[in-house]
Amino acid sequence: MSRSLKKGPYVEGRLLARVEKMNAANEKRVLKTWSRSSTIFPQMVGHTIAVHEGRKHIPIYITEDMVGHKLGEFAPTRTYKGHAGSEKSSGLR
């Protein structure tokens, strides 16, 4: 379910302010953020944002195709290592 149109997209104010400040200064550096629920805005294109995934920050380079999506979509929080194999399938006898 998407957010109400009258409210508009959510982005953490501090994150957007830092991106706009970097755009004005024409600098590129990695921005760390814990705000996985922030929507990617067009001003963020070309920047690298390190999104927290629960343990560490995952650097994500923002492209035009990502605009409108959430930052958390590109930093998975769960790692799947596969099911434990049975002794029959492992080949050891």
Swiss-Prot record:
InterPro entries: Ribosomal_uS19, Ribosomal_uS19_bac-type, Ribosomal_uS19_SF
UniProt keyword annotations, A-Z: Ribonucleoprotein, Ribosomal protein, RNA-binding, rRNA-binding
GO MF annotation terms: rRNA binding; structural constituent of ribosome
Recorded family membership: Belongs to the universal ribosomal protein uS19 family.
PANTHER family: RIBOSOMAL PROTEIN S19P FAMILY MEMBER, SMALL RIBOSOMAL SUBUNIT PROTEIN US19M
Entries under HAMAP family matching the protein: Ribosomal_uS19
Protein name: Small ribosomal subunit protein uS19
Protein encoded by which gene: rpsS
